[in-house]
Amino acid sequence: MTTTIQQRSGANGWQQFCDWVTSTNNRLYVGWFGVLMIPTLLAATTCFIVAFIAAPPVDIDGIREPVAGSLMYGNNIISGAVVPSSNAIGLHFYPIWEAASLDEWLYNGGPFQLVVFHFLIGIYAYMGREWELSYRLGMRPWICVAYSAPVAAASAVFLVYPFGQGSFSDAMPLGISGTFNYMLVFQAEHNILMHPFHMLGVAGVFGGSLFSAMHGSLVTSSLVRETTETESQNYGYKFGQEEETYNIVAAHGYFGRLIFQYASFNNSRSLHFFLAAWPVVGIWFTALGVSTMAFNLNGFNFNQSILDGQGRVLNTWADVLNRAGLGMEVMHERNAHNFPLDLAAAESTPVALQAPAIG
């Protein structure tokens, strides 16, 4: 007599699903972080596309002056944006079910919160998925560490800055010109160009571009010849080959003579660590700078700091930036009741004309 033992299909199905999720043989690795990443990024992308095309104007300032951001309301690819949620909403969580109607939700900029929250969860999950795949393959975890730099930057402009300023209406709009507007207003209100963390970020981005171009051009110029003049040099490399495809000694000698010896790396591993670390650390500092300025710890103020012998101001670049910032601020605050205090013409009235005696 033959006895057949069959496992319960439910448990077997769940095990198959777990094996599929964590398998490194799939064309695209899913992972448990991917189970969270895929639906959130799909939701954010879908809502962004629909809102960018067809969303009605949003009362961003909370003063019944709606701002149109979608293509169907007269914008183009450059000027269009998903407008941030209304200042009347502030920092309140504003899902669809919190509004009295869909029209109210759209008028108050609900799609912005939907896109941003799903997007942030999605990129956090993507970073976790990078770590998860590295772990499965036995690799070091530095890929997700490098990715943490743009994640920190996105978190700073979409989450930390609105928290510090008290409203999601101060977050960065989701569009090209909206991004530029955010940058101009940020300079006007926080003097970011005079903040040392922003300077470190500029050095990180521009320096990273320079080092990447230098490295790529040096490697391309010192490739080991494997092809004829009539063939593409790319045919001289076979994926997985053990031989070096370029002569690092030649590249080191060239760059050492071009500048000086110790400006050139003689270790490929330390070189590539430097290429990764430089822009990552710079963008970390930028994100940290935006996060501190969110709570109004602003850039340095050197306005009218240099005087001549008669006490007259000698304008410096700091004064030029200050005048530009005042102009940008008055254009941004276009209503009388929001007129910037530092542009008020009248002298401020002291609360007490005489300090009370203590003791």
UniProtKB/Swiss-Prot annotation:
Q: Does the keyword Magnesium apply?
A: yes
Per UniProt, chlorophyll a PD1 binds at: H198
Q: Detail the disulphide connectivity of this chain as listed in its UniProt entry.
A: none
Q: How is the cofactor bound?
A: The D1/D2 heterodimer binds P680, chlorophylls that are the primary electron donor of PSII, and subsequent electron acceptors. It shares a non-heme iron and each subunit binds pheophytin, quinone, additional chlorophylls, carotenoids and lipids. D1 provides most of the ligands for the Mn4-Ca-O5 cluster of the oxygen-evolving complex (OEC). There is also a Cl(-1) ion associated with D1 and D2, which is required for oxygen evolution. The PSII complex binds additional chlorophylls, carotenoids and specific lipids.
Concerning PROSITE patterns, the annotation shows:
REACTION_CENTER
Membrane-spanning regions, if any? 29-46, 118-133, 142-156, 197-218, 274-288
Q: Report which reactions are catalysed by this protein.
A: 2 a plastoquinone + 4 hnu + 2 H2O = 2 a plastoquinol + O2
- A GO term (biological process) for this protein? response to herbicide
Its EC number(s): 1.10.3.9
Positions contributing to [CaMn4O5] cluster binding: D170, E189, H332, E333, D342, A344
Q: Where does chlorophyll a ChlzD1 bind?
A: H118
Q: Where is the major localization of this protein?
A: membrane
Could you identify this protein by its name? Photosystem II protein D1 1
Q: Which gene encodes it?
A: psbA1
